[in-house]
Amino acid sequence: MAVVYYLLLAGLIACSHALAAGTPALGDDRGRPWPASLAALALDGKLRTDSNATAAASTDFGNITSALPAAVLYPSSTGDLVALLSAANSTPGWPYTIAFRGRGHSLMGQAFAPGGVVVNMASLGDAAAPPRINVSADGRYVDAGGEQVWIDVLRASLARGVAPRSWNDYLYLTVGGTLSNAGISGQAFRHGPQISNVLEMDVITGHGEMVTCSKQLNADLFDAVLGGLGQFGVITRARIAVEPAPARARWVRFVYTDFAAFSADQERLTAPRPGGGGASFGPMSYVEGSVFVNQSLATDLANTGFFTDADVARIVALAGERNATTVYSIEATLNYDNATAAAAAVDQELASVLGTLSYVEGFAFQRDVAYAAFLDRVHGEEVALNKLGLWRVPHPWLNMFVPRSRIADFDRGVFKGILQGTDIVGPLIVYPLNKSMWDDGMSAATPSEDVFYAVSLLFSSVAPNDLARLQEQNRRILRFCDLAGIQYKTYLARHTDRSDWVRHFGAAKWNRFVEMKNKYDPKRLLSPGQDIFN
């Protein structure tokens, strides 16, 4: 969850207008002539080379690195994408790599195309009428353009009484972007990541061919693209499984000062039921967890937007009484419909769940909210941070999958070790996932154990010159894991060394990844910002 430059010689403005009109331009600022086939493309959209367009495509949410492209394509149809990629394949010596930018939410330039062509996918949705989101007549799935954002998929689905089963925490990401990574949130323990909930896709490969794929049709492309980091093609349509949408969510948080109790309860809430065939779970619809380091405990508790001032004061006092350097909180929901009887049943079911947990007595908190409001909860934080000028700051995030057998070691070494005594701005999230709900044939890489933890250290650099400290802190965390022999997998990361990518995927999956690259993007055109093949 989708989960992102130019120049000219003399006559920049005139050449830019010429390209937009589809007539030949002189070339780029490196002295490379525009291929005749590019200059002659009959595009419905616009290919822009002006500084406004290229500068906007040279940065991302991470706000750590930047790279100017040579041009930005604003497509008006999927035909524009086919035309661009077909020209790239048919032109000898084509010098431009191609990246597909959704909402620019990559962290380290993964959606950049330095000196190449960035495709602004949002333009595809802007040009579409009606919008490229359609719920099936039987309510079994929703078809969504790869450029569509999940908040719009939610709204269109709710209008028909249904909703996708698996989400991201933040809904203003594109369908194609998150499916190119995995797409995880607190529903993934029971439904798998978003990539496990895709029924069919339309993909334009690196050859410029539009291919419909599924588990039954062109299955190798289907599996490769899901979690494939944009290396094999661009998703222009995804068919996503949906379910009847609940109306409300009972939103609860339980507080712990003991990591063993915290993690055991998380696993209890997310474990498949015995005899359920691996697909039957307890009543909770969503389960995540948060870690609060004592140095910034009060601020971070308040920043959740969940706890009242009185709640924060009580939790801070609890930490003091127990001399706790870290506090943990399970966050969960139990979804239900609007009927009074359903609300009463939720009360009863929640009481039953509470009786099985080992949180600190008296430290269970709950709220009742609309289902859509819960799913869109992070957007309110975005609005608030934007007003304070704290949203568009560097985000040196570190996202990992840690095997269950080593999560206690991670807690001791990182939460109770490296992060102690540091200033932390941003949430620390940790929750278990079931490997059985992932399809290992897809490109996404996960640890080998049956249960592993998603760990998201979502740091923001808000103090002057703090970015370098946070980046070094991330390196210390990774060094600790390496030295401790923790077989983690990074998520949403960019490696710059081929051996790191081989380690990330594992030998067998890496060999398959290379095979699919050779088949579907042999010229190594796509998504150069991932630094896998470029």
UniProtKB/Swiss-Prot annotation:
Modifications after synthesis and translation: Glycosylated; with approximately 10 hexose residues per site.
Coiled-coil ranges from the UniProt annotation: none
Tissue: Expressed in immature kernels and unpollinated cobs. Weakly expressed in kernels harvested two weeks after anthesis.
Residues bound to trans-zeatin: 169, 381, 456
Disulfide cross-links: none
One Pfam assignment: FAD_binding_4
Protein localization: Secreted, Extracellular space
Reactions listed under catalytic activity: N(6)-dimethylallyladenine + A + H2O = 3-methyl-2-butenal + adenine + AH2
EC number assigned by the record: 1.5.99.12
Function: Catalyzes the oxidation of cytokinins, a family of N(6)-substituted adenine derivatives that are plant hormones, where the substituent is an isopentenyl group. Cleaves trans-zeatin, N(6)-dimethylallyladenine (isopentenyladenine), isopentenyladenosine, zeatin riboside and cis-zeatin, but not dihydrozeatin, kinetin and benzylaminopurine.
Family: Belongs to the oxygen-dependent FAD-linked oxidoreductase family.
Protein name, per record: Cytokinin dehydrogenase 1
Gene source species: Zea mays (Maize)
Gene: CKX1
